[in-house]
Regions:
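Alpha-helical protein-protein interaction scaffolds
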Residues: 35-110
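Signal peptide-proximal N-terminal region
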Residues: 48, 137-156
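Beta-alpha junction/loop-to-helix N-cap segments that form part of ligand/metal-binding clefts
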Residues: 77, 93-113, 127-131, 149-216, ...
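Short beta-strand segments enriched in small/hydrophobic residues
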Residues: 110-135, 140, 251-256
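Periplasmic-binding protein-like
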Residues: 118, 175-190, 207-210, 250-256, ...
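Short beta-strand elements at the ligand-binding edges of bilobed clamshell
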Residues: 128, 206, 215-240, 350-363
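An alpha-beta-alpha
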Residues: 140-141, 222-287, 307-308, 398, ...
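Extracellular/periplasmic periplasmic-binding protein-like sensory domains
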Residues: 325-393
């Protein structure tokens, strides 16, 4: 097939596919609007050091001798050696998504592959980056083991954007200029996606974010998609739970004034909660406040008569949400958006996080007989979370669009 001149067909297919992939939220204990490109500010470090098809390791935490030998061979275009070494690496650490992607890229290299990109915050939040990569890696492996896309295997180029908007713009610009990149899975935070989306839109390159749900992303253009449901849906489900199930009539809310998704969630939650007859405490709680004091926030909320506290967490300020959880000591009922669904919440919140209610766009037990969770356990040795599932959906949507 031709390369980017097939994008219109891809967009039509994606529009249909993404409509089928909507997952909803669960609680548990055609005209292109071209925009001018924004200036791309400089950043420290070489862009080439941040992008790899298999010629360099980006996730330094997962280095081992076989993986290093594999990427060295890949860089020398010695694909048989790369395949053998990366396969040996995966036998030692099967749940390494970067190694899976490079392994499949090496196998696809000499078979007229189709290429996409995935951009994740390896240097910003490694756990989240690997969660997204797992979904992409699984979708790539499955399609390549089943004949590829019209007989052509899929390659995935990985970029590390650190969730830094200035770096995102550089990566987006590079991929738009690379006619072999047919679509992009990314980015993670809404601020990152909002930085890259106008560049992809102007360059007619499809971008699908599995995790960005800020309201502003929806209006950028017809090449911009996401697999995560709207932030309004997330806020509505949590607000209804607080009032109807948990019977909390007055809540305090913490958000990050510097993160668009966090602010979007706060605005939507307040509107939904107010419409249902609830009351929002007027205490100030901003995760970006330089002198943020979690204990003071809890004390002020209790003094103001709040019965619960909603955490509109942001990826860059997750630690401050965890500080709130630890400082709470069970005094307020805690609820949070899907951003706080991370391993760090369990690791650092521990017993203080018990009873907290999270909104999530996907859960392995939410859809009976869904084959994805079972297959994911075989790949990764345990359950995956919503970021992996929606990254898998994003990649599957691109695959469907390219067929």
């Amino acid at each position: 097939m031709s390369q980017k001149n097939e994008t219109t067909i891809l967009i039509l297919a994606l529009a249909i596919t993404l409509g089928l992939l909507f997952t909803g939220f669960w609680l548990f204990n055609g005209v292109i609007n071209r925009q001018k490109d924004q200036p791309i500010p400089p950043f420290t470090g070489s862009l080439e050091e941040r992008i790899s098809l298999g010629n360099k390791i980006l996730v330094n935490a997962d280095r081992n001798p076989n993986k290093e030998a594999g990427v060295t061979a890949f860089a020398k275009v010695d694909f048989p050696t790369a395949i053998a070494q990366l396969e040996s690496s995966l036998k030692k650490k099967r749940n390494d998504p970067e190694a899976w992607i490079y392994f499949n890229n090496a196998k696809a290299a000499e078979n007229n592959p189709l290429k996409i990109g995935v951009s994740v915050p390896i240097g910003g939040n490694l756990n989240i980056a690997k969660e997204i990569l797992r979904g992409v890696a699984q979708a790539q492996d499955e399609v390549n083991n089943n004949g590829g896309i019209n007989g052509m295997p899929l390659q995935v180029e990985i970029a590390n954007d650190d969730n830094d908007p200035s770096i995102v713009k550089k990566i987006a610009d590079k991929w738009v200029k690379n006619t072999k990149i047919l679509a992009v899975v990314g980015h993670n935070t809404s601020d990152a996606s909002l930085a890259g989306a106008p560049i992809y839109q102007q360059g007619n390159l499809v971008m699908i974010s599995p995790t960005s749900n800020a309201k502003k992303l929806s209006g950028i253009g017809s090449y911009i998609f996401r697999t995560i449901p709207s932030i309004s849906s997330e806020a509505e489900v949590l607000a209804r739970y607080a009032l109807k199930t948990n019977r909390l009539s007055k809540l305090a809310i913490c958000a990050d004034s510097q993160a668009k998704a966090s602010q979007s969630f706060k605005e939507e939650f307040i509107a939904k909660f107010d419409n249902e007859g609830g009351e929002i405490s007027q205490i100030a709680c901003d995760f970006s406040e330089p002198n943020f004091n979690a204990s003071a926030v809890i004390s002020q909320a209790v003094s103001d008569g709040a019965e619960g506290l909603v955490l509109a967490a942001s990826v860059d300020k997750i630690k401050r949400s965890l500080d709130i959880i630890i400082a709470n000591k069970g005094r307020l009922s805690l609820m949070a958006n899907s951003t706080l669904y991370t391993i760090d919440t369990l690791k650092f919140g521990q017993s203080e996080a018990l009873g907290m209610v999270l909104a999530a766009p996907w859960h392995p037990e939410a859809i009976p007989d869904n084959p994805f969770p079972k297959n994911a356990r075989k790949y990764w040795g345990g359950d995956v979370n919503w970021r992996s599932a929606l990254a898998y959906d994003a990649t599957q949507a691109i695959i469907a669009g390219l067929k």
